[in-house]
Amino acid sequence: MSEDARVVIIGGGVAGASIAYHLVHRGWEDVLLLDRGELTSGSTFHSAGLVGQLRSTLTLTRMMMYGVDLYRRLKEETELDPGWHEVGSLRLASSEERMEELRRLSGWGKTFGLPLEIISTDEALERFPLFDPDGVIGAAYLPTDGWLDPSSLTFALAQGARAGGAQIRTGARVTGIETDGGRVRGVVLGEDDRIRTDIVVNAGGIWAHELGALAGVTVPVIPMAHQFLVTKPLEGVRREFPTLRDPDLLVYFREDAGGLVAGGYERDPASWGLDGIPPDFNHRLLEGDWPRFEPLSEGAMKRVPSLQTAEIVTLINGPEAFTPDGEFILGESDVRGFFVAAGFCAHGIAGAGGVGRLMAEWIVDGEPGMDAWKMDIRRFGSHYRSRRYALERTHEIYSTYYDIHYPNEERRAARGLRLSPAYPRLESLGAEFGEKSGWERPNWFRSNEQGSLEEWRPRGWAGRHWSTAIPKEHLATRERAGLFDETSFAKIEVSGPGACAFLQRLCDNHVDRPVGMVVYTSMLNSGGGIECDFTVTRLDDDRFRIVTGTAFGDHDLGWIRKHRPDDDVRVRDLTSAYACLGLWGPQARDILQSVSDDDLSNEAFRYMRAREITVGQVPCLALRVTYVGELGWELYPRMELGIRLWDTLMEAGRPHGLIPAGYRAIDSMRLEKGYRVWSADITPETDPLEAGLGFAVKFDKGVDFIGKAALERKTSEGPSRRLCCLVLDDHTAVALGNEPVRAEGEIVGRVTSGGQGYSVGASIAYAYLPAELSTPGTGVEVEVFGRWEPARVTQEPLFDPKGDRIRS
């Protein structure tokens, strides 16, 4: 039997129901929602149901805030009560470090528009008098948080979806996803029932990995056994109790029918179902694991002593889909039309409303309405095909869920996977490695530490994962030269007869330039937002190389392939084919020329040019570009020649004072030079004009590039806000992102990125401010861990404003 549907959603949990609800509200009626059992019978029915809105990113916080707004009005719309209890939330602090975390959260709350308050222990007790205040030094209170009944919410959303024309079919087990030519063509049910469709949404919860495999898509979710207990009614418990979290004890609480729910995130988590989930696992729980729950039980009884005598109704133990980085997995995969909405890390109830709206936008409009990068499925590289790798990373995420996560903190799990050719040399030089997209990358070198630079140590948390080697490497590069291993940079080749025309349509800059030219450009979405930014080098008439950030390779590849017109254009990922070393500084030319017979003079090899050269015995592609604001080159040899190139340059550079340097020095130098970071300073929600990148937009290149019409409208109106460079009065007060900025007592913006500029002697922060406040000299304040730091808008770039050094 065959039938047709415009979109098929697989998974009748709260996410699937929300997506169906929001699709019909966008006018799509031919929506089919399938579930292998009954609605909510996977993970939704056993969720604890807590709703906390404040998250680490603006997008996720906005999604949660939208969800609360939806839950408030859903009963009136659908005539079904979602069980929303807007009782507020309390988060306790039992240490000064935890109190610092709450102060930081308070700043984020101001930035995101949430009424988060820092309150005293006594004020917290007034709201939840059953907790023992011993050791508690304060709390954060958010009155608009709460909790709801997961099943009631799902049924209300499903009712709203049905009212809009959606069909819901239970007992429908998906056994196949049909694809052809890299896109979805249909869904197979049971033995041979087929549904023809061009769009499938995998909202399969703990089955999302298995469903993804049917389409050849890796969805790295790991089912984790999550436990909480439920008590009978307790004396003193009131319905209006706020939810309570004590992260230092790893536990959370909420009221339930006069009793309490108490759960948490243990240090020794248990995964489940990795060898396959039983086919009859519908509306079922796992057996309670009291030995594993005991540390949480002890913490819960310590904080709420009345639990010691409470009658326990049950210990709920249910699998929840977690991800290797603790973020949702959303968006369209490499298989066109196959969307994923999974891996909600026990926050699917809180996120359901926002997930439904975002996914509906993505499906209907072809793009999400917000910057969804941190949740985009394209953030996961091919190494996540390994279940062992995903499992190890996910275990770490779960076990450290309630830990304080300090700025620039590095993950420890599943390290040492992707190594550059020079890795042994970096290790021998005392590299302090960080990890990005599986690559080991030097943040700094312990061999460069210098005590006299201790005066630069940032105040508070920003000084935790910091070293005097960072300013040493920065200053040495500015004064002499630094050698940087950038092998992890993603490299993409676009080739074929139609390559140039294709890139002209995708890029806002003019890339149809002579062979050997390097162009900085963005790729925009239909609204003029920046989807990608990178350099494009023309290697031949029909061959171009794109170099983009380590973490953005799969994202940018996905965007390019999504718009690839036909077989006249070939797109290849060359990241693992070539190493990359960056050599920068005033001595860079002398060092490189000493080991190359090629003419590297300014007249022969100008800025933003590229050509093949030989360095010692190593042939490589040399790009005269910079991300640090200094004379120099990026050198791209074949991967197997990378270590020889490193050795050649280090030996040649010794008489010139060359030092190995890391990514933290790069970041401080790019701040001084005003170079933007995609995903922070520029995103799909920001356009080149307000970001100060209008110089790279070529309206007159004779091509209607994607986003051009939207940018032309913005040009005629003029930017309402601008990305501004702020200098804080105190060079040890470092803003790292999301801190609020105020002028005359009013919140006017938030920090996108920040750090220290050691050459200019300042703490630097970037923030979007209203256009009327963007004039250099304007005074503002930036809140850094609860203290308002004076700052001023400055003309950028702070370092080498005329660009003389990079063109020398």
Spell out what each predicted region is.
Residues L70-R73, H85, S94-G164, R169-T170, ...:
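Flavin (FAD/FMN) cofactor-binding and adjacent substrate-gating region
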Residues D248, E287-H405, E410-A414:
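C-terminal catalytic lobe of FAD-dependent flavoproteins
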Residues M370-D371, I377-S808:
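Glycine/proline-enriched, intrinsically flexible loops and inter-domain linkers
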Residues G49-R127, D248-F253, A257-G259, D280, ...:
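Dinucleotide-binding Rossmann-like beta1-alpha1 core, especially the glycine-rich loop
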Residues V24-T44:
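Glycine-rich FAD pyrophosphate-binding loop
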